[in-house]
Amino acid sequence: MIKDVYELLLSRKNEIEKQISLLDETSNNLLKEKIKEKWKEYCQTQGKLSTVLAIDGGMWIKELRSGIVYIVNAEIVKAEGFNVTPIDSKALIGVLRPGNMAKERVSLLMQLLELKLGLKHGDKAEYILFDGSIVKKIGKHKFSTKISLLDDIDVMDDKIYSLEENDEELMHKYLVAENQLVMSALISKYKGKLVWISKNSKSTELFQENISDVSLLELFTKNCGYTIGIEKKISSENIISPKASTILSNASFYSFYTRLKEGEKILKIEMFNNEIENIISILSPISIKGYPYPLLKVHTDVKVSRQDRERIKQLLNIKKKDIEWWPSQLF
């Protein structure tokens, strides 16, 4: 019962508070030196006015006794300064039965729509901004055997071939493969334009501490600047498509952290080149509170709000729970 939780919390209050406080004085001094070695203060006051594309997606799933209802959508916008214009969008709605790995598959569907929009319209601007990370787009699954069944698909086609598979486990693998095929085509065509931006990275790869790199940088730095770029490689173990493997396996990319505006949040950026100050000069002039406005705008457009969810349920005649505390799985 929740009463037991409160009793446990009171008995361990001091211990938990110490862990929340993060660091002692000795650790503070050591980390300050560590960060000083890797953080370069750099404020871009002028910057370059370039055209950029920003892409993001939204998703919603509803678990029912009959299966999983899902909705995904994605949008691409073009920005010149703070003038943002929608270019194209895609949406899907369907039911997964019985619904195993539903969240993972719906997330892959959303991601696939994003990548397809980038591939279709990548020639319309100098840079293409995605929310998230390269590794997340590739997937962290490890596959002992490759799947070549989808290697001959037309990646420019609007069709999602994986949805034709009824077996849920196979569909999941096909979705990973289809994402990787579109991703490899995107890299082949627009490698130098691609930029991934993450605002919630939990990575510890730079400082190798048990606290995230972002948390440490936000704790010990306030000015705008960036960290040294780290070269990374896409692991061949994570590539399930033989055709995609020719482009993606062991491909190098660079990651670094930056703060675009003084006192604002730290962002993690990944690209296929190490031109850090150049991309900062592109992003700084179009940022609000330290985050690129085009990505903020497209995120707002695709987000499935609470009001949207209620309206969708009404349109689909999904009845509302009579008892609010009743578990959704039994509804």
Curated annotation (Swiss-Prot):
* Enzyme class at the top of the EC tree: hydrolase
Q: Does the keyword Kinase apply?
A: no
Q: What induces it?
A: Part of the nurA-rad50-mre11-herA operon, these genes are cotranscribed.
Concerning InterPro entries, the annotation shows: DSB_repair_nuclease_NurA, NurA_domain
Q: Which UniProt keywords apply?
A: DNA damage, DNA repair, DNA-binding, Endonuclease, Exonuclease, Hydrolase, Manganese, Metal-binding, Nuclease
Q: Which EC numbers does the record give?
A: 3.1.-.-
Gene Ontology molecular functions: endonuclease activity; exonuclease activity; metal ion binding
Q: What mutagenesis or variant effect is reported for residue 114 to A?
A: Lack of nuclease activity
Per its UniProt record, the required cofactor names are: Mn(2+)
Provide the residue positions that the database annotates as binding Mn(2+): 56, 131
Activity regulation, free text: The 5'-3' ssDNA and dsDNA exonuclease and ssDNA endonuclease activities are inhibited by SSB (single-stranded DNA-binding protein).
- Disulfide bridges in this chain: none
Q: Which NCBIfam families match?
A: NurA_Sulf
What is known about its subunit structure? Answer: Homodimer. Interacts with SSB.
* Domain writeup: The C-terminus is required for interaction with SSB.
Q: Which family does it belong to?
A: Belongs to the NurA family.
Q: What is this protein called?
A: DNA double-strand break repair nuclease NurA
Please name the source species. Answer: Sulfurisphaera tokodaii (strain DSM 16993 / JCM 10545 / NBRC 100140 / 7) (Sulfolobus tokodaii)
Task: State the gene name recorded for this protein.
Answer: nurA
